[in-house]
A protein has these predicted regions:
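Sec/Tat signal peptide C-region and signal peptidase I cleavage site
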Residues: 5, 13-20
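Low-complexity repeat regions of mature extracellularly deployed or surface/particle-associated proteins
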Residues: 20-205
């Protein structure tokens, strides 16, 4: 079991503002890991890799990452958050990325069975992407603000995809479920003024 907690803050006491440009990379393996990363400010990059990672183009060998809980919290603008587990021995995980601010990009790449991935973004011009494979998974993206984009790309059976977008401006949701994917469901809710668009593609056996 691994427990990692990272908190990065750079605060000016005179201006009460946060500045950043920090990079955090967490690579771990093993069952029952608990990882929490919090960043405040702008221009930060966060990468969390459980079981296998390729943040710097070098790979960690595939290992068990069952029953992991991974949480990333971002407060600021122009940040990137990326969380990944790949292909094998990665069941019963809970992944979450929470973002407050504008122009942020969040990705969860999660594989295997009985997992939950959630991205929550509050602000404007934010993008979110969830990639997943395996069975009996739940994928959620919740966005509040102006001009949001959400994308789901899955290779899964018996899974649920939920997207909620609220606010003014242009919102877009893209859902793609690949060939040989059965018994899945999609729920898309879009509220507010402006253009709303949803593209949903299902392919079964």
């Amino acid at each position: 079991m691994v427990r990692a907690i990272t908190l990065l803050l750079l605060i000016s006491l005179h201006s009460i503002q946060a500045f950043a440009d920090n990079t955090v990379v967490v690579q771990t393996k093993g069952s029952g890991s608990s990882i929490t990363v919090q960043q405040v400010g702008s221009g930060n990059v966060t990468g969390v890799y459980c079981g296998l990672g390729s943040f710097d183009s070098s790979l960690v060998n595939t290992h068990n990452c069952d029953n992991a809980t991974i949480g990333v919290s971002i407060d600021g603008s122009s940040n990137i958050a990326y969380a990944q587990s790949v292909w094998s021995n990665h069941d019963s995980q809970v992944w979450s990325i929470t973002v407050d601010g504008n122009d942020n990009y969040a990705v969860i790449d999660m594989d295997q069975d009985d997992n939950t991935a959630t991205i929550i973004q509050n602000g404007n011009d934010n993008d979110a992407l969830i990639l997943g494979s395996g069975n009996n998974n739940v994928y959620k993206i919740e966005q509040t603000g102006d001009d949001m984009y959400a994308k789901f790309q899955t290779f899964a059976d018996n899974s649920d995809i939920w997207s909620t977008q609220e606010g003014t401006g242009n919102h877009n949701v893209f859902v793609f479920n690949s060939n040989q994917a059965d018994n899945n469901s999609t729920r898309v809710i879009q509220k507010g003024s402006g253009n709303k668009d949803a593209d949903i593609f299902w392919y079964n056996d």
